[in-house]
Curated annotation (Swiss-Prot):
The modification N6-(pyridoxal phosphate)lysine is found at K276. Its cofactor is pyridoxal 5'-phosphate. The keyword Lyase applies. Catalyzes the production of hydrogen sulfide (H2S) from cysteine. The keyword Acyltransferase does not apply. It catalyses: L-cysteine + H2O = hydrogen sulfide + pyruvate + NH4(+) + H(+). InterPro entries: Aminotrans_V_dom (IPR000192), PyrdxlP-dep_Trfase (IPR015424), PyrdxlP-dep_Trfase_major (IPR015421). Its EC number is 4.4.1.28. This is Putative L-cysteine desulfhydrase 1. Residues 1-45 are annotated as: Disordered. One of its GO terms (molecular function) is L-cysteine desulfhydrase activity. Residues 11-22 have a biased composition (Low complexity). Residues 1-10 have a biased composition (Acidic residues).
């Protein structure tokens, strides 16, 4: 019979304990009190620099990879754990489905529940990514409009810097169903958390104008582009004070970048990817709902399977034949982070300190500045590019990003700051040129100072050579031929 493939006896014992507690027994519903995460391995010493390099030796050599934010990273030990699950399925898929899959998923859900201080393992569902979690929440909102629980014109609030796929999902699901979508126009560069809170309050007043009900607020914990840590606990409290029905926190980047306590934050729905900053292989995320919320039982995975109606954790745990291995190795990711001094909090703290240090180094070299104060950064920071590079569009930044990748072997996202908040002047560099382009640099355990020096030198060379973004734009003739 197939069984959970543990790395060691501790993991096996954790799985056995899960079964005894009622969430490791066959294909049961997985409800019960949240247990502690599976015990981590206890190596004799913390992981060494050489061991870290070995864990990520599959990264392409010579590339300055300062973009952990987009796709995350996965160490070799986690890839090995994933492969064990994949082989278990391939060896005997029927036995795997009936006896190993659901206990393994409950083991991962239990690990997440302990990680984020969920009240019950039943509050945690595993999904592919935060975009899927958003679809689950927004689908319910759309049904509420369609079935008359919400009135046409009721509002949904979101940040202007919400992730692009989530913004499109809001329009595809709830705007189409009859919602009025109101955006919070956040300034950038950002001066303080107070500035974000003020803009949020003002936008909420707009959303409530004329007695309109605000049915849902979608708030990022860390915005993607530009990257800013949002004061979510304060914004959730404001939503409660102002009578917003539900609050959904899109925290795609949060686990591993900032502390997460879902009960302390107090939102109705909270999602975060585990493959971005928590070392899981892609793709796996969790969606947390509150067990005392009647809406939780009305949420459904957008892919309808045989588990429809058995609760979101079960629906998400089987959406048809596919590779579930990324969702099954969450306990092993906890083992991995516990090899570092201070565990995930130690990693997070060191990444934050280093990315701020590297961001300041780049800003000084380029005569620019950081896009946010350090307290509004996690393990990512926005750094202004010299204004003389002449970034004037999203197309410009994509072409420049491609050039940095191909010509300099630097992988970094670039942001075009096109918006000007009323009464806010466009920030300028040391030469008085408007700063319209920003790089978003990340720091993860595999990064070294030389990665950022490579980026620094590439941009300095472009400036010294008199490069401007216009040189990468297609000619009028090329555009006509296309």
């Amino acid at each position: 019979m197939a069984s959970i493939p543990p790395d060691d006896d501790a993991a096996a014992a954790a799985a056995a304990g899960a079964a005894e507690n009622g969430y490791g027994n066959g294909k049961g519903n997985g409800n019960g009190p949240a247990p502690r995460p599976p015990p981590a391995k206890r190596p004799r010493s913390v992981i060494s620099a050489a061991q870290i390099r070995a864990e990520f030796e599959h990264h392409e050599a010579g590339v300055a990879r300062v973009n952990n934010g987009s796709f995350g990273c996965c160490p070799s030990s986690l890839l090995d754990a994933q492969a064990r699950w994949q082989r278990l399925f391939i060896a005997q898929p029927d036995d795997f489905y009936f006896h190993a899959l659901q206990p393994g998923l409950r083991r991962s859900r239990a690990a997440v529940a302990g990680l984020v201080n969920a009240g019950d393992v039943a509050e945690v569902s595993l999904v592919d990514n935060a975009t899927t979690a958003a679809a689950i929440v927004l689908q319910h909102a759309a049904w509420s409009f369609a079935e008359g629980r919400f009135s046409r014109g009721d509002a949904v609030l979101m940040l202007h810097y919400a992730y692009g796929a989530v913004k499109k999902s809001i329009h595809a699901y709830v705007a189409r169903a009859g919602a009025t979508v109101v955006e919070v126009p956040l300034p950038f560069p950002v001066a303080s958390a107070d500035a974000i809170i003020a803009e949020f309050r003002a936008a909420l007043d707009v959303a409530k104008a004329g007695g309109r009900k605000v049915r849902l607020a979608v708030i990022d914990h860390i915005t993607s582009m530009p990257s800013v840590v949002i004061p979510v606990k304060e914004l959730v409290a404001i939503c409660r004070e102002e009578g917003v029905d539900k609050v959904f926190i899109d925290a795609a980047h949060s686990i591993g970048q900032v502390p997460v306590d879902v009960r302390d934050i107090g939102a109705d729905f909270y999602t975060s990817n585990l493959h971005k900053w928590f070392f899981c292989p892609p793709a796996v995320a969790f969606l947390h709902t509150r067990k005392d919320d009647p809406i939780a039982s009305q949420l459904h995975h957008p892919v309808v399977s045989h588990e429809y109606g058995n609760g979101l954790p079960m629906e998400s745990g089987w959406i048809g034949t596919r590779d579930y291995s990324a969702q099954l190795v969450v306990p092993e990711s906890i083992d991995f982070v516990n090899r570092f001094e201070g565990g995930i909090e130690g990693i997070r703290s060191r990444n934050h300190e280093k990315v701020i240090e590297m961001g300041k180094m780049l800003a000084e070299a380029w005569g620019t500045f950081l896009g946010t104060p350090p307290e509004l950064c996690g393990s990512m920071v926005m750094v202004g590019l010299p204004g003389c590079l002449g970034v004037e569009s999203d197309d410009d930044v994509m072409r420049m990003r491609t050039m940095l990748r191909k010509d300099f072997m630097v992988e970094v996202p670039i942001y075009y700051n096109s918006r000007r908040v009323e009464a806010q002047e466009m920030a300028k560099d040391k030469n008085g040129d408007a700063v319209t382009g920003y790089v978003r640099i990340s720091h993860q355990v595999y990064n070294v100072t030389e990665d950022y020096e490579k980026l620094r030198d590439a941009v300095n060379k472009l400036v010294a050579d008199g490069f401007t973004s216009s040189k990468l734009r297609p000619s009028q003739k090329q555009e006509t031929m296309a």
